[in-house]
Design a protein with these regions (language model features):
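Basic nucleic-acid-binding interfaces
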Residues: 1-20, 28-56
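A cross-family detector of function-defining hotspots
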Residues: 25
Length: 56
């Protein structure tokens, strides 16, 4: 899955970009936080796990 597609899904769920980490971008929704690897392509299993974690 492309990183931008995963980010779009998180933003639809109310997450907003918070900051850049070392190799990850951090998105927040209230007290919830998710770290997204800064790569063009993200492993499908990882992307699905992130979406499943937030019920998306």
């Amino acid at each position: 899955m492309k990183q931008r597609d995963l980010v779009k899904e998180l933003e639809k769920a109310g997450f907003e970009f918070a900051r850049h980490g070392g190799n990850h971008d951090i998105y927040k929704r209230g007290d919830d936080e998710e770290k997204i690897p800064r790569h063009r392509e993200i492993n499908e299993r990882l992307a699905k796990a992130i979406l499943r974690k937030w019920g998306l």
